[in-house]
Amino acid sequence: MSEHDLVIRSGTIADGSGGELLDADIAISGGRITAIGKVAGKGREEIDASGKIVTPGFVDVHTHYDGQSIWAEELSPSSSHGVTTAIMGNCGVGFAPCRKGDHDMLINVMEGVEDIPGVVMSDGLPWNWETFPEYLDVVASGKRDIDVAAYLPHSPLRVYAMGARGAAREPATADDLATMRKLCREAMEAGALGFATSRLSIHKTADGGSIPTFEADIAELEAICGGMADAGTGTFQVVLDAFVGWDKEYQVIERVVESSGRPATFTLASGNDGPPRWRRVLEMIDRTNASGGKATAQIMPRPIGLIAGLELTVHPFILCPSWAKIAKLPIDQQVAAMRDPGMREALLSEEFEPGHPFNALARDWNWLFPLDNPPDYAPPKEMSMAGQAAAKGCTPQEIAYDRLLETDGKGLFLAALGNYENGTLASAHEMLSHPHCIPGLGDGGAHYGAICDASYSTYLLKQYVQKANGYRFDLAEAVHMLSHKAACAVGLNGRGLLQVGAKADINVIDMDRLELHLPEIVRDLPAGGQRLHQRATGYDATIVSGEIIRRFDQSTGARPGQLIRGA
């Protein structure tokens, strides 16, 4: 009879603490780690990890699986990249609390902010909840491969408490604030991980309006976070408005942390050019933590960007007036139309019409690059559309247009919007090296047609550990950032560590085989919707609560994932 449920043999362990690597076995029983060292007893199942690294499961603190966690059992791409815990409800958008009459409004917000087609949400969600605790119960009742936790999102909370006034962004009254504070406390007591909001000006609804939380008074955020203080738990997650300035917006963090006593986490990035204001923000974070508060910045390890292409939500010609004539054609007919000299002349000369802010970002020729297989997320500046045009003596539009024709419309572009200061990863590396910064902003479950960044864990290991082209982290440090450090930032202090008694969330990774593949379009959403997915190779095994959910980069069908209720 086997003494253990599972034994991982002879791996090199990076235990998530950032400490020394250890060559040892790991024994697992009952979903927990029972031994680390030389394990004598046999396992019911065994994994030979010789020559491989063994890590804790990774913790992705910024996802939007609020819908996908209900309509799907696999939280991919995240679970394809070693993530075993995903935090959803970020940016203050989600589906609860919500009265029946407000379903369409929340769909409109989610479609605009997170690029999830409306029909996917209307067809894919049962909407069999009203309150946030009821929503958590629905999530808890489902089956999935990895664990999830959820923030209480500000937009639906505001509309639920204020009705049409909340959607119209009217100031909250004292009664409104008291109601939202009470609902926040109730959400924390039911198992919410915290409260989330967005102040970002380019977060728009599908019809182009501002989301309910845009420009909400800081006093409103203090009141709601008072509900977390009342409950004695919860993390405040916020997307600050980068267009106002991270340093100017940081007062939101300072005031909420001071008034509520709750920790905060937020997204931080560098611009590609201009003054490095992010360094000033790092100083502010240090000040917050030195004074007894806690603030953590989430950093994307590669350029924050969009993926553009004819079959996706954005591409360099989508808002040209003539594009409307062929927008609804199949891609082969679009390409045939683009080969016509008249259409070519029109699309190369026309200016963009007004539209969602994301569309214009695919026309920043200085930071628009080809994305091929294997994908290069840190390309040289001369590979940009502007750089290639300068070398060839033509316009950037022509370079982009010809790429689309040469690839029969299948060619992809990377629009690097930030974290690529002066065309290098230096700023991302420096921010990630900071004691109060963690990797984040994977956005899994959202931006289905424009972003596929949930693969950042694989990228960090590949780019900063294996390649280390000028910007390096050692393996133990990188694993620490992806696991325990990330978990602690949102109050999940017991996760992301390989130690006896810990939950058995584990990766076995073949670093020699580790590769990140070009994003691809899959059509597996409700109502036949499509999304971007990105695969990796090199994950020999991913384990959740002692069950192997993925083996050699393929799902095993195991569904041990659960809802995490509270920190």
Language-model segments: residues:
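Histidine-rich, glycine-flanked metal-binding segment
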Residues: 2-7, 13-57, 519
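Divalent metal-coordination and catalytic microenvironments
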Residues: 11, 31, 51, 62, ...
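Acidic, glycine-enriched loop/beta-strand segments at the rims
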Residues: 14-25, 412-422, 428, 474-479, ...
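A structural motif
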Residues: 58, 83, 192-193, 233, ...
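Divalent-metal coordination cores built from histidine and acidic residues
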Residues: 71-194
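Active-site neighborhoods of metal-dependent hydrolases
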Residues: 135-139, 145, 151-161, 168-174, ...
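C-terminal cap of metal-dependent C-N hydrolases
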Residues: 426, 430-437, 442, 456, ...
